[in-house]
Amino acid sequence: MNYQILNAYPDVKTLAAWQDFLADAAYPTHYITPGFFTDPFIRGGERFAVLAFEGEKIAAVLTGVDTGKTIVSGLAVRPQTVFRKETDRAAAAKALLEGMLEKGGDSLEVINFHTWEPVEKSKSLGFSSEVCSGGDAVVMLDLAKGADVLFKDFSQTRQSELKKAMKKSELIVKDLETDGEIDELYAIHVEWNKRKGNLPDSREDFSRLAADKDNRKTLIAVYQGKVIAGTFFRFCSAPGGGVIEYAGNNSLEEFQKLRPNPLIGWRAIEWACANNLTHFSMGASHEFLRRFGGDIRSNYRYTFDRTFLKRHEKKEKLKKLLVGTYLFLPVSARRKIKQAFGIT
């Protein structure tokens, strides 16, 4: 296989080949479509894509960011490497690696990329690999089951709270549409990030998010005319069916007793089932998401370390060892460590 590196939106010929790939790709998501190059929420470096070709057809697509010394493609909970169904994933991964090495040049030290499916013979290509379990796993729903069957797979707690929420006639879930709704949700977004100690997105990017009907869906919960919550989703509407991903939520704490977020999640599942999407990735696997049923899916992380004695790999292993040791400690000991470092 050979490869092509892109640093911007593709030309007409490449776009056609890319669209053909998406129709036969396993787990196509928004961030492995050409829309990756125009999405306002890609940050952290220069964005690029590597396309692995087998003849005239694309066999795999990888998107990511290049920071100079590091190339990163996706996260454990959000892979940005996808293969055509039935393709030789090892051969495709080799072509993708060659493309990333060319993209990074002499200054490149380490590559990290993530996949939904395992890459056979990855060690022979020079990769270290890891199954992303635990907190790096995701809840995945098979939308082919249909909304009614999926609802029955929800936990009893989730079914009960949804039935109660749906009885509240003043609580509705709808698409984010008007400027007034955008203003209300943006105010919640700013306050939510303030509580978390994060920087909010710009009002301009927020407006673009609401305007994007091809790759994103934002659902809001409105109670007595007031926006009280909003959840953001990304999706790929490939001809063969794509994946929808939970991308984030902002909500008002004082209205959580109304259960707006579970209701938004349910309406999103209903919409996805009705719109030819094949899988719903919840983007994480904590208890709130597990109550939607589905499978706990562990994706794959691959690292290619070019440094002397593989410095980056060793640093990452030490970090995981320290985190694992910390989590194993009694709560009282963890509290003292937090106090010592001024962590609240």
For each of these PLM feature ranges, what is it?
Residues 45-47, 102-106, 274-277:
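Short, high-confidence coil segments that cap the C-terminus of an alpha-helix
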Residues 92-93, 158, 202, 265:
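Amphipathic coiled-coil/heptad-repeat helices and related helical stalk/stem segments
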